[in-house]
Amino acid sequence: MKREIFPTLLVSVLCLLAACTGTGDRQEPVRNIIFMIGDGMGLPQVTALSLEQGYAPTRMERATYTGIQKTYSAGGRITDSAAAGTALACGEKTTNGTIGMTPDGRPLESVLRRAQRAGKATGIVVTCAVTDAPPDAFVAHNPDRYAQEYTALQYAGSGIDLLVGAGREYFDRRSDGRALTDEMCSRGYAFAPDREALLAARTTPLAALFPGDALPLAARDTAGIRGDYLVRATQKAIELLSGAGHDGFFLMVEGSLIDRAAHENDTEGMLGELRDFDRAVGTAFDFADRHPGTLVLVTGDHETGGLTLIPPHGEETGTATAEYVFSTDCHSATFIPVFAYGTGAEHFTGVMENTAIARKLKALIDVGSRQATDHTHPKATTETNLRERHTQQPFP
């Protein structure tokens, strides 16, 4: 019962907040949402990035509102990316290893799905496989996060406008022999096999799927594959989704490999991924500056590595240097920062459950959709009204 009442109350509260400002004027509705997740990025990682820049402000520090979120999963103090991704994407706790479902197997609606129902263009940009957690939680329902072929099947029928990341093998080198990219192309998708094709794309729907389970770490990319990929891909995604002719857009961008480097206790690799992600955040903030009605939300799914910053061995506190020490090669239960910028950012302050983020985003989508309907003209808001060329397909 509480689960049903809370979203209704939240929408009501946000409707009241959106109805007027101090002057009695209607507040700008949230039209576009850019949700940015640093996988494995906790307060220690954000601190390390600031320290490495000589305490010069990071792009994330441009945020006008900040908060803290708790990451524990259903039945566990330390979450994995599947449970954390489900909380951030859908607004409910679940067990580790579970994607887009409650512990008892009930499918959950994600923020991305809610945005589709509101008539928005939708997209995902990541540096890992698109079928990995947490991005998969925005589209799929899967009791086993490692059943990535099944997740790919759900992506293929999801109606998402833009899908960018690694993991092509789960679409085209499958145990069932199906070529999902061909099936997607038959429904109107363009396919971009590499970065150059992605950046040259002009329309959606688009699937840019790269080989392997992830792109190279930015700091270890001797082949020049990575470069400024995340920044350029974020820019391209915003360009395509904002020009898609929908009632705004929802874009999820993940700096996926902060987590991988931290699992390996690779300080240089971790810092390289943090810098890359921070540059992408700056791109999103810049777009919000130019386009009122845009909310940019930045957070992590959990902290990885149990990172601490301490004086070098034998030195006193107050030294100009610091030593990075990882206490584990796994996740920790550390609280995670939340940075909010743009329209609606004021709703993401204080200490919150990770589930509150998705619930508030859904409520803001609902409020914006109602205001658009009330003050312009009725808009198609069901999944069946998505463009026919890439409508959702049933999956076996």
Language model segments and positions:
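Active-site His/acidic residue clusters
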Residues: 133-139, 212-222, 237-238, 245-248, ...
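Short, intrinsically disordered C-terminal tails of secreted or membrane-associated proteins
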Residues: 391-393
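Metal-dependent active-site segment of extracytoplasmic phospho-/sulfohydrolases and closely related
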Residues: 43, 275-316
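Bacterial N-terminal signal peptides
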Residues: 8-17
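Structural motif
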Residues: 35, 163, 208-210, 250-254, ...
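N-terminal catalytic scaffold of extracellular/periplasmic and nuclease hydrolases
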Residues: 21-174, 180-198, 204, 303-386, ...
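Bacterial N-terminal signal peptides that target proteins for export
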Residues: 1-9
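A Trp-anchored, charged/polar loop motif used as the substrate-binding/catalytic surface
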Residues: 190-194, 225-243
